[in-house]
Structure formats: structure tokens, C-alpha cells
Amino acid sequence: MGSYMNKTSVVKVGNVLIGGDNPVVVQSMTDTYTADVEKTVKQILALHKAGSEIVRITVNDEPAAAAVPEIVKELANHDCHVPLVGDFHYNGHTLLSKYPECAKALAKYRINPGNVGFGKKKDTQFAEIIKIAIANDKPVRIGVNWGSLDQALLARLIDENNAQENPLSLQQIMHKALITSALESAKYAEELGLAKDKIIISCKVSEVQDLIAVYQKLAKECDYALHLGLTEAGMGTKGIVASAVSLGILLQQGIGNTIRVSLTPAPNAPRTEEVRVCREILQNLGMRTFTPSVTSCPGCGRTTSSFFRELTSKVKDHLDEKMHTWKEQYHGVEAMKVAVMGCVVNGPGESKNADIGISLPGSGESPVAPVFIDGKKAHTLRGDNISEEFIEIVENYVKNRYGKK
């Protein structure tokens, strides 16, 4: 795992610390109409339960702004105190001024320099939001997006570039514009009185190589806390892979303090998928541990039986279900490693390397399944109840190994 290239400022968002030596924070965003309090609260609760440590909500009109305090109140009634970030575009200055209770209830404001205001109004409207943030002691994310980049700034940089003897490519100018927009806005916010430890910045694009290039340069040019994410990752496998590759490379280099995976959900798919992907990225990089990991083989001609796949699914589902109570009872259980293997080739070796593992018989092998605990063979299972018996062994292992807090 890489070490931080630059020690960033630490920003407190509600009860969550972002930056410095703090763990990378998982974020998500709702897709409900914020004024629908019931649906919005339900989705925030689901995202938080899935592991989102900060949740962003759209605040795009007066009904949404008016609903924010009620949303926070309803969440508290469910004993949920996850920090909420208000996502503002175009009219944030108006909504925050007109609805001061909204400004107080939110834990952070997101401002887009590309649409906070246009022409002479840009600086004035940006300043209005910053002053409200200062008055309410709130942090701000200055979130630049290449789909809504400040066109006046881009035109200025293009003109300057055209006058150079060795001009940059259009792609390089786009990268420069993203970074310049973020850093000039952050500098202006500081000039207005917002402390550096109240500022998080992001420069989001939709292509993997562009994101990597922009953040590598950004990390060298500033010590603000950085929010990572592709702006539109896409749907399904494409979105997951693009996010894992881009965020994984940057995080491994020590760049990034908080992440969000902007997946397009499949029809009727749970919004929580983006949280699961964030957690898997961080856990597979060895940066954080959230739930016991299950190592399992993909199957081959030696494993003609589907039983090992079924057992793997049962074990993973059982661990995911139990973690809601285990994390309160058993300290360190989230780092447990379980192996479910399908034949003798790699089964015993992987099982020995896990905290607890089972090596199922492959085609033509003796119909027995040795169980290894802490590297040593501890049980031999056979018959029709291997799944139930192995899960019971896992349960007992957790109780004996991790004990109660």
C-alpha cells in the first residue's frame, strides 16, 4: 500500500474525519426526490446500513431545501446520524439563504464552480455560499466536473495556450482547466475566510486515464483533502471495473481521502451496490476491513459438482448477515479470512492460509471435506450436512477466536 504523497488537511464532516492519516471514507448519493421525505430517509438508511459513512442528497429547489431538516430529524428517530451533504447547482446561494434551517442541518455543502454563477454573478454567488458555510461552521466540497466546466475559464486557458510556442493538447488543456478551476475556487474561499480544514476538492471526469492524470497532478499541487470518483462510471461490470481500476491506482499511490463510485443502477437494482463496490475496493487494497473475506475457486473440470459454489454463496450470505451483530460483539472479526475451495489441487493450501477453510472433494476424489483452522486440519466433514456443519464451525470459531468486546 502506498504512503500519502502529501499530507492533506483534515476536514471534519459531521462526526467523520476526512484527510490526513484518517482512513479513506466511503460516500454515496441518493437518487430520490429529496422533498419526498419518506423515500429519501428510507434510502439514506439503506445506504448507511450498507456502509456509507457520508450520504449526499440533491438540494435543487425550495421543497427539497425545506425538507432537509425534517429528513435529519427522521434519521435521528431511527438512531441514524450519518452526515448529509447538500448537492447544490445553479441556485445554492438562494436556497441556503432562504432556508437557514437547511444550511444548519446539512453537514457539508457541495459547490460546482462551473455553474455556481455566470459572468459577474459567479464570484458574488460563490461568496454567498462560502459566507453561509463560515457562519454555520460547515465544510465545503468544491467539486469540479468536466461536463459542467467553467466555460469562461476554459476559453481563457485556450487563448493563453494558443499564444505559446509549444501549446498543450486539448486534452492537457482540459486537465489544466479542471485543476485550475478547483484551486482558484479554493483559494478564493480561503480569501473569504473559509479555513483550509473546511475545504475538500474534487476534479471528476468519466475516463479512467484522465482521472488518474488529473489527480496525480492535483495531489502534487495542493494539500487539500481530495474526493475521488469517476463522474459517470456507467452500469454493471463496466462501471465497477472502471471505478476499481482508476480509484485503485490512485489510492495505491496514496492519493485520495474519500471515495464515491457513481454507478448507474440496473432497473430495480438496489442503490446500495455503489457502497459495496467502494468497500470492496478499499478492502482488497488492504486499506480497510469491513467484513470477513471469502476466498473461493472459480471451478474447473475437476469440480463438476456445483456444491462448492452453493456453499460459497451460503457462507458469504451468512457472514454478511451476521456482521451487523458480530461487529458489536466481536472485535476484529471483520478481518477474518475464510476459504471455500472445490478440489484437492489448491484447496488444502488455500484453506491452511485462511483463518478457517474447507477443501471440498472434486470429481473422482474421496467424498470427504477437511476443515482447516489457523493452518491446521481440525475436522473432516462428510455426508449431506456439510454446509450446516461448516457454518456452525465458523460460528464457534468466531466466538472462540474473537471473544466479546
Swiss-Prot record:
**Tell me, which GO biological process terms does this entry list?**
isopentenyl diphosphate biosynthetic process, methylerythritol 4-phosphate pathway; terpenoid biosynthetic process
Highest rank taxon of the organism: Bacteria
Q: What class of enzyme is it?
A: oxidoreductase
Q: What is this enzyme's catalytic activity, as reactions?
A: (2E)-4-hydroxy-3-methylbut-2-enyl diphosphate + oxidized [flavodoxin] + H2O + 2 H(+) = 2-C-methyl-D-erythritol 2,4-cyclic diphosphate + reduced [flavodoxin]
Cofactor notes: Binds 1 [4Fe-4S] cluster.
Its pathway, per UniProt, is: Isoprenoid biosynthesis; isopentenyl diphosphate biosynthesis via DXP pathway; isopentenyl diphosphate from 1-deoxy-D-xylulose 5-phosphate: step 5/6
Cofactor(s) for this UniProt protein: [4Fe-4S] cluster
Sites where the protein binds [4Fe-4S] cluster: 297, 300, 343, 350
The yes or no answer to whether the keyword Cytoplasm is present is no
Report the GO molecular function annotations. 4 iron, 4 sulfur cluster binding; 4-hydroxy-3-methylbut-2-en-1-yl diphosphate synthase activity (ferredoxin); 4-hydroxy-3-methylbut-2-enyl-diphosphate synthase activity (flavodoxin); iron ion binding
Q: Which family does it belong to?
A: Belongs to the IspG family.
Task performed by this protein? Converts 2C-methyl-D-erythritol 2,4-cyclodiphosphate (ME-2,4cPP) into 1-hydroxy-2-methyl-2-(E)-butenyl 4-diphosphate.
Official protein name in the record? 4-hydroxy-3-methylbut-2-en-1-yl diphosphate synthase (flavodoxin)
State the organism's lineage. Bacteria, Pseudomonadati, Pseudomonadota, Gammaproteobacteria, Thiotrichales
Protein encoded by which gene: ispG
